[in-house]
C-alpha cells in the first residue's frame, strides 16, 4: 500500500531524530538498556545489584566501609588513553563525583586506545566520555569542562573548579589526577595543587608506548613535578618545536590500560584507606620491570608555593612512635614436670664430651650436669684379632670363650 506524502515525511523525521539523538548525547543512546539510580550500595548477592562484587571487599576485610567512596570527588585532567580508562574504572567503582578536563576532540586515530567508539568521532572528549560514563553508572555525578587549563584565564577556572568542586559544595576535591600528554599541562596542574595544597597523582606513558609510571605527590612531603623536572622543562624548551609533521607518538592500549589500572588501584587505596599507596611506581613492558621509589622535595625548587609547603610540612609535629613494653606475664603452668629450662640465645654451646662445666648467663642454670668420671680405671678386655689363616673351628672356639 503506497504511503501518503505526510506519512513519508513523518517517517523521515523519526529516522532523522533517531540519528541525531546519539550525537547530542555524546554518541550514546541512553534510552536503551539503561538502569535506574541506586540510592544505597547493597551487599546483597543478586544479578541485579551492580555493587555486590564491590561490597564483597568488606566481607573479605579488605575495606572497612566501601560505601564511603560515594562521598569522594576526583578531578581528572586529560581524557585520553589513560584518562578515559581511569574515568571508566572509577565510574564502575561507584565514585561519588568526577570532574573531567579536556579541550580535544575524539578522532578515529584514538580508536587504537580503549573506551571511545567510532561513532563518537568529532565530539569533544569530555562530552563523549561524560555521556558514556553516565550510561554506565547513573549514580556518579559528572562535571565536564571543555577548555585548555594552561591559558591564563582558564587556569583560574581550573583552580576554582578543583578547590570548590568537592562532593560538598565549596569544598576541594579529594584528589587530582593528571593524565595529560604534555609537560606544560603537568606544570599547570603542579602549580595549582601546590597553591591550594592538594594531593595529586601524575601519570604518563612513554613516547614509544612500552613504559609508563604513576607518581603520588603530596605538597611539601614528596617532590613536586618542578622539584625534579624533565630536561624539556628545565631547559625551557618549547614542546611544540619538537613535533614533526607526519610523525606521532606510539600508543598501545595495553600500556595505557596497565598504567590506568595502577593509577586507579592506588587512588582507591588512598580514598578508602587500605593497603599501601605507592609514591612512585614505574612499568617497563619490555622486561616486565616495576621499579618503586620515593622522591624527596627539592629545597631549591623553582615553585615558590612548593617551598612554602615544605616549610609547613617541616613545622608539623612528627608522630611519636611509642614502643610497647612487654608485660610480665605469669607462667602458664605452675609445675615443670619435665624440668624444661630456657637458655639464652647467646649462651655458649655445651660440648657433651667436655668435662668442664660451661659458664651460663646471669639468672640461668644448667638443667643437667654430667657425672664426673671415676678415678679407678676399669679393666679393659683386650681382644686379639685372629690370624688370617685361622680355620673355621678355631673361630668358633674363640667365640664360645668370649
From Swiss-Prot:
It comes from the Eukaryota. Keywords: ATP-binding, Metal-binding, Nucleotide-binding, Ubl conjugation pathway, Zinc. The keyword Calcium does not apply. Pfam families: ThiF. SUPFAM superfamilies: Activating enzymes of the ubiquitin-like proteins. GO terms for molecular function: ATP binding; metal ion binding; UFM1 activating enzyme activity. E1-like enzyme which activates UFM1. Transmembrane segments: none annotated. Residues 369-402 are annotated as: Disordered. Zn(2+) binds at residues 224, 227, 301, 306. This is Ubiquitin-like modifier-activating enzyme 5. GO terms for biological process: neuromuscular process; protein ufmylation. The active site is at residue 248. PANTHER family: UBIQUITIN-ACTIVATING ENZYME E1, UBIQUITIN-LIKE MODIFIER-ACTIVATING ENZYME 5. Belongs to the ubiquitin-activating E1 family. UBA5 subfamily. GO terms for cellular component: cytosol. ATP binds at residues 81, 102, 125, 148, 182.
